[in-house]
From Swiss-Prot:
Keyword Ribonucleoprotein applies: yes
Name of the molecule in the record: Small ribosomal subunit protein uS7
Keywords: Ribonucleoprotein, Ribosomal protein, RNA-binding, rRNA-binding, tRNA-binding
InterPro entries associated with the record: Ribosomal_uS7, Ribosomal_uS7_bac/org-type, Ribosomal_uS7_CS, Ribosomal_uS7_dom, Ribosomal_uS7_dom_sf
Gene giving rise to this polypeptide: rpsG
Superkingdom per UniProt: Bacteria
Gene Ontology MF, one: rRNA binding
A Pfam family reported for this protein in Swiss-Prot or TrEMBL: Ribosomal_S7
Family per record: Belongs to the universal ribosomal protein uS7 family.
One GO-annotated biological process of the protein: translation
Taxonomic lineage of the native organism: Bacteria, Pseudomonadati, Pseudomonadota, Alphaproteobacteria, Hyphomicrobiales
Species whose genome carries this gene: Rhizobium leguminosarum bv. trifolii (strain WSM2304)
Assembly with partners or alone: Part of the 30S ribosomal subunit. Contacts proteins S9 and S11.
């Protein structure tokens, strides 16, 4: 890790269809091997399926899904006197969003539907209704932090 300069945040452009920066970040996270057009087709296709199934605006479903997945606290390892404690710490807003996007994509990839569009739309709908494995991951993270609340005085 460099001690001299902090890396600058890169500017990203909003996506062409909705004009939303979070959707662009989501597309970039889904993208494999630099194939952005494939990632766009997956995301926009999933949004179309979500709109057809839920009769709601896909962007609101997407944002509510991310809000339901994003963790508020997580545990970090802290070594104190030969023992390693799992210390609960609050999650910064940028990290909350990044974790939510990462967990949503991982949960969608593990699903059993045939195409990624179906998997992603199913996980988005589940997450917006507080179901699904991405929401379970958030609950597990919160339980872990709650169980280790006794070590919260080791924060840094």
């Amino acid at each position: 890790m460099s001690r001299r300069h902090k890396a600058e945040k890169r500017e990203i452009n909003p996506d062409p269809k909705f004009g939303d920066l979070v959707v662009t970040k989501f597309m970039n996270a889904i993208m494999l091997d630099g194939k952005k057009s494939v990632a766009e087709n997956i995301v926009y296709g999933a949004f179309d399926v979500v709109q057809g199934k839920s009769k709601q605006e896909p962007l609101t479903v997407f944002h509510s899904a991310l809000d339901n997945i994003a963790p508020h606290v997580e545990v970090r390892s802290r070594r104190v006197g030969g023992a390693t404690y799992q210390v609960p710490v609050d999650v910064r807003p940028e990290r909350r969003q990044a974790l939510a996007i990462r967990w949503l994509i991982a949960a969608a990839r593990k699903r059993n539907e045939t195409t990624m569009v179906d998997r992603l739309s199913g996980e988005l709908l589940d997450a917006s209704n507080n179901r699904g494995s991405a929401v379970k991951k958030r609950e597990d993270t919160h339980k872990m932090a709650d169980a280790n609340r006794a070590f919260s005085h080791y924060r840094w």
